[in-house]
Amino acid sequence: MKLIKNGISSKDESGEVILRPEEPEDMWHTYNLITPGDELKANTYRKVVSTSATGSTKSEKRKISLTLRVQEIDFDPKEGSIRVKGVNVVENKFVKIGASHTIELEPHRNFTLIKSCWDTIFMERLKLSCDVSKKADLAAIILQPGLAHLCLITSHMTVTRAKIEKSIP
């Protein structure tokens, strides 16, 4: 994971960080950093409906930046994506304050995480996730008749990279 900006106050341990997950394990760390009540700022797409002077409507998807107060977090390890559901806290041209929305976090896309208190557990996870020397990988192949799984093992998770099935007569 790449730490783009660290804006955590040393006085009250509040503040924000801008992060860019770069691999599946970074998504796991991201999932463990975000908790309900945090604020998350990221780019997303929203369907915007506009009405013309004649009364006809036109809808289009627009890329917008939203800041959500996190209510729920879902992690899909197979896809390497995180869905964050929450309520908009910063009004913009297309989304009002209080509107519900879901942001999907993906590798190689920056996001800003704002916490009222970065405690020692979150600080350790942040430090660990950004430390390249801690990411030693091990590959494992699990075999049984007619089936093989190729897995990558890191210090925090196991990722299945391939499943090979072959019928044996």
Where are these predicted regions, by residue range?
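Extended, charged alpha/beta regions that create polyanion-binding interfaces
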Residues: M1-H149, I153-P169
